[in-house]
Design a protein with these regions (language model features):
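Hot-dog-fold acyl-thioester-processing enzymes
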Residues: 1-83, 146-149
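HotDog/MaoC-like acyl-thioester-processing domains
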Residues: 3-10, 89, 93-149
Length: 149
């Protein structure tokens, strides 16, 4: 059975399946969506500010978000979202890094004007295989309320 807005609790944390980024995935994403040399050119990246190729923070953000969505935890409640706030790329993600993601419910606010919905703020955090936090962001989710009870 799916969960509606009122079924979630502040402080609740959900885990998602981890993912590993390889060099090919990093290069393919960056060439299309974030074409900076430290994401697209292995040789140039060696002499760059990070001492080697690193993944785009936007790729990491997308994959962390995707893994939580794929977990199904928000399948019933989600009506999309009006925004993302406090995006922080905390550490580079390098080829071979395995990232695990968690999502924590920060706040739940039923709408005063539309009783079938509300807003839920969810903090996503991604950690590498050494358990170092590499990314953090907060989504603003428009969430369905169960109006049949």
């Amino acid at each position: 059975m799916g969960r509606y807005l009122d079924d979630f609790k502040i402080g609740e944390i959900f885990q998602a399946e981890s993912f590993t980024l390889d060099e090919k995935q990093i290069l393919e994403f960056a060439l299309s969506y974030d074409p900076q040399p430290f994401h697209t050119d292995v040789a140039a990246a060696k002499d760059g500010p990070y001492g080697g190729l690193i993944g785009s923070g936007f790729q990491t953000l997308n994959l962390c978000f995707c893994r939580i969505v794929q977990s199904g935890v928000f399948d019933t409640v989600s009506m999309g979202g009006p925004g993302i706030e406090e995006v922080k790329f905390l550490m580079p993600v390098r080829p071979g890094d395995t990232i695990h993601t968690e999502a924590e419910i920060l706040s739940i606010k039923p709408s005063r004007t539309k009783p079938d919905r509300g807003i839920m703020r969810v903090q996503y955090r991604g950690y590498n295989q050494q358990d170092n936090e590499v990314i953090s962001f907060i989504t603003i989710m428009l969430g369905k309320r169960n109006t049949t009870v």
